[in-house]
Amino acid sequence: VARLLVAPLLIALEKTIGSSEYLQFMKSFKYPLSGEFSFRRNVLSELRISSDWGIEVGVLSEMQRNFSPNNICQVDLADTYDHKHQDLSLDDETKGLSKMSIDIIKTFIKKLATQGNSFSRETFRSLKATYYRCALDMIDIYRSDATMNGLQFDSHTEEKAVELFAVNIMKAGDDFYVNPMDTPFIPTWSRVKSAIPDFLTKLNKAVSEDNKDNS
């Protein structure tokens, strides 16, 4: 998804709505969907976290909004990674990589909308076409890399994924129009403490009791 959706989508967004500090920031990450983050504790209280597969993109977006880029970095924690693959789910947009792609696209759309960008149906059609061309160009690059390194490369499967993601750009756009009041974040810890002042005490007690039961 990072190779075939996020990377070409960011390029397509730049071409469609114009470059911005936000898009440049997101493009700077080698693995924007790694799912591994480390923060100082004071950062978490005001962090608005997405409640779906857009969580990685959402967290990076919040960090870019709230902090200077020189306070943020990416690191390699290991030489190898145990990547958990999911099915493409061509026939069911509520599962697998299909749902993941829709959630990620919606997260980008909502983040850019909060920055004053307007999205019309024509914008989404242009974005879909631009993404598709960019993604196919990147597949050519990946194929060449695989050939140079003596690796097998399944062009058919790669292009099937790109075709699905292109369709899902329109689906994400339709959902953006149909559900304009959809809340994209779970409440921040600051809001939780404001609504339930003793929540953290109760949470700490519940975790302690749960640990006792499992010990």
Segment roles from a protein language model:
Residues 3, 53-57:
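Short-chain dehydrogenase/reductase
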Residues 1-37:
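Acceptor/aglycone-binding surface of glycosyltransferases and processive sugar-polymer synthases
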Residues 73-94:
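Active-site donor/metal-binding and catalytic loop motifs
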Residues 87-215:
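Terminal low-complexity segments of carbohydrate-biosynthetic enzymes
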Residues 11-16, 66, 74, 104-111:
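Conserved, well-folded catalytic cores of nucleic-acid-processing
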Residues 43-44:
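A generic structural signal for short hydrophobic patches within well-formed alpha-helices
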Residues 51, 61-80:
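Catalytic donor-sugar/metal-binding loop of nucleotide-sugar-dependent glycosyltransferases
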Residues 32-34, 38-39, 50, 54:
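A conserved catalytic-core signature of glycosyltransferases
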